[in-house]
């Protein structure tokens, strides 16, 4: 009997091949890394429970939930504000019990939805990363306006994305729905080609 067991596939399986692409230069303008090892979840606070939720997160993770589009993180766990009473939680790598644990710890305080297999996550860095992102993202990413710890929900080439600045290098994280991974990859690689890019 044929083996018909389902196997998990990365959102960009067959597309994100390691190597150098685009314009030839000594140093690629952008370095692209797909992250497939993160545990992801959305949180929506229950009515009247926001203060209790903040206390529970602080006790469990040592993190103060921030209001507004900012990210708070500690020891590989982060909570990004994505709306009123809403956060996007991430942990990893290898934090396989993060989402079930989050549900248990926040019982009756927040609705927790596992997003680990539902998103494509890309990390981008390099001297020309802002130039590439500026081709499609209508957010001012100049360091005066978008800094480490900032997050925004926006569009790129009609694709809904969440963008976060992870550090001052800068490294940016782009996240979109799994089903739109191919479209996002097509836009990104075409936009980065003139500067040269490396997939790692």
Describe the predicted segments one by one.
Residues 1-200:
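Basic, glycine/lysine-rich polyanion-binding surfaces/domains
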């Amino acid at each position: 009997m044929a083996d018909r067991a389902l196997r998990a596939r990365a959102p960009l399986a067959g597309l994100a091949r390691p190597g150098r692409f685009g314009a030839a230069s000594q140093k690629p303008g952008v370095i692209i890394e797909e992250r497939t090892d993160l545990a992801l979840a959305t949180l929506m606070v229950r009515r009247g429970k926001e203060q209790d939720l903040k206390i529970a997160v602080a006790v469990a993770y040592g993190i103060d939930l921030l209001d507004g589009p900012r990210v708070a993180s500690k020891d590989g766990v982060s909570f990004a504000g994505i709306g009123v009473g809403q956060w996007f939680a991430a942990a990893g790598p290898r934090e396989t019990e993060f989402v079930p644990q989050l549900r248990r710890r926040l019982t009756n305080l927040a609705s927790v939805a596992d997003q680990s297999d539902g998103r494509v996550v890309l990390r981008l860095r390099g001297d020309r990363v802002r130039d590439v992102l500026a081709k499609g993202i209508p957010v001012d990413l100049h360091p005066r306006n978008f800094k480490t710890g900032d997050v925004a929900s926006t569009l790129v080439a009609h694709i809904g994305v969440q963008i976060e600045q992870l550090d001052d290098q800068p490294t940016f994280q782009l996240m979109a729905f799994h089903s739109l991974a191919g479209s996002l990859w097509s836009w990104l690689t075409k936009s980065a080609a003139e500067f040269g890019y490396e997939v790692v």
